[in-house]
Swiss-Prot record:
Organism field: Mus musculus
Domain of life where this protein originates: Eukaryota
Phenotype upon gene inactivation: At 10.5 dpc, knockout embryos exhibit normal heart development. Adults show attenuated phenotype during calcineurin-induced cardiac hypertrophy compared to wild-type littermates. Reduced thymus and lymph node cellularity at 12 weeks of age. Decrease in expression of lipopolysaccharide-induced NOS2 expression. Loss of increase in mesentery arterial wall thickness in response to 7 days of intermittent hypoxia. Simultaneous knockout of NFATC3 and NFATC4 results in embryonic death soon after 10.5 dpc. Embryos appear normal at 9.5 dpc.
Entry note about domains: Rel Similarity Domain (RSD) allows DNA-binding and cooperative interactions with AP1 factors.
Residue positions, PTM Phosphoserine: 344, 372, 1065
Region ranges (3 X SP repeats): 207-308
Modification note: Ubiquitinated by STUB1/CHIP, leading to proteasomal degradation. Phosphorylated by NFATC-kinase; dephosphorylated by calcineurin.
Sequence repeat locations: 207-223, 236-252, 292-308
Name of protein: Nuclear factor of activated T-cells, cytoplasmic 3
InterPro entries, alphabetized: Ig-like_fold, Ig_E-set, IPT_dom, NFAT, p53-like_TF_DNA-bd_sf, RHD_dimer, RHD_DNA_bind_dom, RHD_DNA_bind_dom_sf
Lineage, broadest ranks: Eukaryota, Metazoa, Chordata, Craniata, Vertebrata
Length: 1075
């Protein structure tokens, strides 16, 4: 912007500054170095400021002819230029004339403005090769192209007329100048020693071949400007003195002799001058004594010399890296507000574990943000300081509070004690650390600028008391620090620290130590005090929010995080030389006076769990409760957000003062099968909420009321069997064995869905039962009950769970007994089951009284209710009933039951075939479900014919079943036994109980069930039941294994232990396969 004539006796002529045109006169030939004052005549360039860069077509530098001696005239000029120029000339002074013979234009001082854009570095690299091919004779011929002002009219750039500050002049930014040394730069820093030591420590990491200053490239329009004038980049004000890959200075001209820089008139000019807030230019540290009106005197990350840039600035001139520092390297393309300056200590002293945090975005940086650290340091160390994001206070990445993983036992070496945020138990073995007296829920913390507000007090008066149980061998130290009280894991609080209280009233000795920048108070636990200590020496200190919030990685806000916990920790010596670490935290303590007066606080509540149906009354006690206070129940999802939120109904007429009575709302999912933990809090407004408390919803045991007589369908006068099928989904896939009513003379079919079984009944009293496991009360009115013992033989725990078939012998009307002492009732039967098993049960049958059975099962427990409103006469032949117990969508299957009771002896009993098929996997219960149950063997004539009832329950899928039990129960034995073939109805995914009988045996007027009888010797048709993958060989193997487990001796023992008033059958019937 200036043109000057550096005459020996003339002052600088700044005509072009005021828009005047004139050719500057050449300097006198006899001018000496002493005639040129450094402040009056520095190296001058001639610029044209008026036209924009796009309109510049010819350089305005005028060659100066008639220089008689370049040694006498240009030596001072070169000295001054090397002293003042930003980049300096590393060429040999002899090359001052162009190859054409004309003298080189005189290089005079100049003021140059440049703006930096993301393309600066790219454009600089693009023209690097142009300079590489230039020989020394042509370098000065092309260099006058830098004698032009490039001033892009960018909105963010300052007006040239408003910024005549010499801060951007080349003469004030020369790295040859003594003013750019670390000694002169340190004058602008408040902490000179720390900055220089930091720079020295970090710069030792650098490679001597890389440029610490970097060379952030040219400006957006600089490329066209260089193309028009064919200029090189050797005088670029942004180039580094070191030979970086982006620098134009080669090894030859760098090692060439260079005049020593003369004394500078501005040795103490600041180099860390702050950039203007609206400018995007990268001022490389002003060495001018005149400051711009905007910059702050304090060092700022917006200045070119910052604590970040010192990382790569050369400090030791003798290290072979650079003769002088070059601290300016960063160019930022966006405007940063002034308040977002980094106030924390230098983040370059990073731990090795944090090094890669800064280097993640290395490849995504724009060229203007890159420095030569990328070339050397960036490839050798993960430490990354070249990102301009580190210069400024950037938004921290989301910090995930992942809970630390503790070790298996809280035993540590004394040399590596656990960190303060490591979770530790409160007790281990016989040692326990406990807080006998909790602190008050509010304590006014004091600030750093005010006096102490005393020690933390207890709610009962006095001070908190901590005691160690289980260890009293020698004194140990109790460590105390201030921890967090939020929903996340316990860790040292960022905004509060413990404060040691001293005075005449303090009876407990203590001392302060620092552990990982957290103040910890050590209090002795003495055996003579029973390892107990009264914490009357600990206060709470509030740190400044601004100091903490601006720390890297800190995401908490001080004014919203005012609750703390007193955390106590001990390290108990162990015989092995290690220590046992225990830790306990107090209740939350509110440290803000405003929050303590405005925020509600829940101290206790009457209940902490209820069923998912809700409806229970809960009394909440606390402080700062208002009439409009609300209690909100919420459940958080996996993302931490509220998954379910509902307001509890507050019973206003019962509330008083600090007590609120509310009705617990029902849980949104009443079908849960396990306990669910939710939270609730009390709020007085949108921003006045208490701390969340935990609450547990427990699942409800489904209750199904038993039906009365009117619920049963009418029973005809004749024994008319009915086949009823009902299916109901159940929320549980529970144990089908667990609950079954003992029903002598019945075929039990217990499945998860509720089902209804009806049989013609005789004169029987009303029957009820109590299911202990389901919590249902069912009463049985019995006229006579006889408990018949039986023997349980465990077998293979493989296969589906099916209850077996039984028939008991009755003579006349009787009742169905049940063992009330058992919560899992079963009928005494010959019970054998296995995977895809075929259980063969031989049961003697006497006259049975048919009774209607109604069973409703709401939770897969099989509650049975039988009524006998009618007295009927049974025909000589009893038609067996077929039960279709569908269970298509269930995974837990139980065996069907058919309860057959006849009033008169049956002359002929048709074979009963039980063939439940279920292609899916079945889950069954534990063998403990087998208990001695009641039955009533009644004397009477034996049945002339009793055919064995084949029991087949193939299951195609793998089934988890209990160890099946073999039960054998018989009344009077029949004299003749026949074996029938296995036949079955094919109902996929259902449980089928098919009973075969002779339809002609029914009276003509009776209703019959359309069931097709199967031939007795017919082989089972596996294809019809969808079990194509099971072969007959598999079935034979299973049947053979089952048969081997049913021994005659066991059956004989069972029958011998059974009191039978009537004559016994001479033969014991055994089951066998039809194959």
């Amino acid at each position: 912007m200036t043109t000057a004539n550096c005459g020996a006796h003339d002052e600088l002529d700044f005509k072009l500054v005021f828009g005047e045109d004139g050719a500057p006169a050449p300097p006198p030939p006899g001018s000496r170095p002493a005639d040129l004052e450094p402040d009056d005549c520095a190296s001058i360039y001639i610029f044209n400021v008026d036209p924009p860069p796009s309109t510049l077509t010819t350089p305005l530098c005028l060659p100066h002819h008639g220089l008689p001696s370049h040694s006498s005239v240009l030596s001072p000029s070169f000295q001054l230029q090397s002293h003042k120029n930003y980049e300096g000339t590393c060429e040999i002074p002899e090359s001052k004339y162009s190859p054409l013979g004309g003298p080189k234009p005189f290089e005079c001082p100049s003021i140059q403005f440049t703006s930096i854009s993301p393309n600066c570095q790219q454009e600089l690299d693009a023209h690097e090769d142009d300079l590489q091919i230039n020989d020394p004779e042509r370098e000065f011929l092309e260099r006058p192209s830098r004698d032009h002002l490039y001033l892009p009219l960018e909105p963010s750039y300052r007006e040239s007329s408003l910024s005549p500050s010499p801060a951007s002049s080349i003469s004030s930014r020369s790295w040859f100048s003594d003013a750019s040394s670390c000694e002169s730069l340190s004058h602008i820093y408040d902490d000179v020693d720390s900055e220089l030591n930091e720079a020295a420590a970090r710069f030792t990491l650098g490679s001597p071949l890389t440029s610490p200053g970097g060379s952030p490239g040219g400006c957006p329009g600089e490329e066209s400007w260089h193309q028009q004038y064919g200029s090189g980049h050797s005088l670029s004000p942004r180039q580094s003195p070191c030979h970086s890959p982006r620098s134009s200075i080669t090894d030859e001209n760098w090692l060439s002799p260079r005049p020593a820089s003369g004394p500078s008139s501005r040795p103490t000019s600041p180099c860390g001058k702050r950039r203007h807030s609206s400018a995007e230019v990268c001022y490389a540290g002003s060495l001018s004594p005149h400051h711009s009106p905007v910059p702050s005197p304090g060092h700022s990350p917006r200045g070119s010399v910052t604590e970040d840039t010192w990382l790569t600035a050369p400090v030791h001139t003798g290290s072979g890296l650079s003769p002088a520092p070059f601290p300016f390297q960063y160019c930022v393309e966006t405007d940063i507000p002034l308040k977002t300056r980094k106030t924390s200590e230098d983040q370059a002293a990073i731990l090795p574990g944090k090094l890669e945090i800064c280097s993640d975005d290395q490849g995504n940086l724009s060229p203007s943000r890159e420095t030569s650290v990328d070339d050397g340091l960036g490839s050798q160390y993960p430490l990354k300081k070249d990102s301009s994001g580190d210069q400024f206070l950037s938004v921290p990445s989301p910090f995930t509070w992942s809970k630390p993983k503790p070790g298996h036992t809280p035993i540590f070496r004394t040399s590596s004690l656990p960190p303060l945020d490591w979770p530790l138990p409160t007790h281990f073995g016989q040692c326990e650390l406990k807080i006998e007296v909790q602190p008050k829920t509010h304590h006014r913390a004091h600030y750093e600028t005010e006096g102490s507000r005393g020690a933390v007090k207890a709610s009962t008066g006095g001070h908190p008391v901590v005691k160690l149980l289980g260890y009293s061998e020698k004194p140990i130290n109790l460590q105390m620090f201030i921890g967090t009280a939020d929903d996340r894991y316990l860790r040292p609080h960022a905004f509060y620290q413990v404060h040691r209280i001293t005075g005449k009233t303090v009876a407990t000795a203590s001392q302060e130590i620092i552990i990982a920048s957290t103040k910890v108070l050590e209090i002795p636990l003495l055996p003579e005090n029973n390892m107990s200590a009264s914490i009357d020496c600990a206060g709470i200190l509030k740190l400044r929010n601004s100091d903490i919030e601006l720390r890297k990685g800190e995401t908490d806000i001080g004014r919203k995080n005012t609750r703390v916990r007193l955390v106590f920790r001990v390290h108990i010596p162990q015989p092995s030389g290690k220590v046992l670490s225990l830790q306990i935290a107090s209740i939350p303590v509110e440290c803000s006076q405003r929050s303590a007066q405005e925020l509600p606080h829940i101290e206790k509540y009457s209940i902490n769990s209820c069923s998912v149906n809700g409806g229970h009354e809960m009394i909440v006690t606390g402080s700062n409760f208002l009439p409009e206070s609300k209690i909100i129940f919420l459940e958080k999802g996996q993302d931490g957000g509220p998954h379910w939120e509902v307001e509890g109904k507050i019973i206003r007429e019962k509330c008083q003062g600090a007590h609120i009575v509310l009705e617990v709302p029902p849980y949104h999912n009443p079908a849960v099968t396990s306990a669910v933990q939710v939270h609730f809090y009390l709020c007085n407004g949108k921003r006045k909420k208490s701390q969340s408390q935990r609450f547990t919803y427990t699942p409800v045991l489904m209750k199904q009321e038993q039906r009365e007589d009117t619920d049963l369908p009418s029973v005809p006068s004749l024994p008319v069997p009915h086949s009823a099928q009902a299916q109901r989904p159940s929320s549980e896939t529970g144990h089908p064995h667990d609950r079954a009513m003992s029903a002598p003379g019945g075929l039990l079919c217990q499945v998860q869905p509720a089902y209804t079984s009806m049989v013609a009944s005789t004169h029987l009293p009303q029957l009820q039962c109590r299911d202990e496991g389901a919590g249902k009360e069912q009463h049985i009115a019995t006229s006579s009950v006889m408990h018949q013992p039986f023997q349980v033989t465990p077998t293979s725990p493989i296969g589906s769970s099916y209850q077996s078939i039984q028939t008991s012998m009755y003579n006349g009307p009787t009742c169905l007994p049940v063992n009330p002492a058992s919560s899992q009732e079963f009928d005494p039967v010959l019970f054998q089951q296995d995977a895809a098993l075929s259980s063969l049960v031989n049961l003697g049958c006497q006259p049975l009284s048919p009774i209607p059975f109604h069973s409703s099962n709401s939770d897969a427990t099989g509650h049975l209710l039988a009524h006998s409103p009618h007295s009927v006469q049974t025909p000589p032949h009893l038609q067996s009933m077929g039960y279709h117990c569908s269970n298509a969508g269930q995974t837990a299957l139980s065996s069907p039951v058919a309860d057959q009771i006849t009033g008169q002896p049956s002359s002929h009993l048709q074979p009963i075939t039980y063939c439940p098929s279920h292609p899916g996997s079945a889950t069954a219960a534990s063998p403990a479900a087998s208990h001695p149950l009641a039955s009533s063997p009644i004397s009477g004539p034996s049945s002339p014919q009793l055919q064995p009832m084949p029991y087949q329950s193939p299951s195609s899928g793998t089934a988890s079943s209990p160890s099946p039990t073999t039960r054998m129960h018989s009344g009077q034995h029949s004299t003749q036994a026949q074996s029938t073939g296995q036949g079955g109805l094919s109902v996929p995914s259902s449980l089928v109980c098919h009973s075969l009988c002779d339809p002609a045996s029914f009276p003509p007027g009776g209703a019959t069930v359309s069931i097709k009888p199967e031939p007795e010797d017919q082989e089972p048709n596996f294809a019809t039941i969808g079990l194509q993958d099971i072969t007959l060989d598999d079935v034979n193997e299973i049947i053979g294994r089952d048969m081997s487990q049913i021994s005659v001796s066991q059956a004989t023992e069972v029958m011998r232990d059974t009191p039978l008033p009537g004559p016994a059958s001479p033969d014991l019937m055994t089951s066998h396969s039809a194959h």
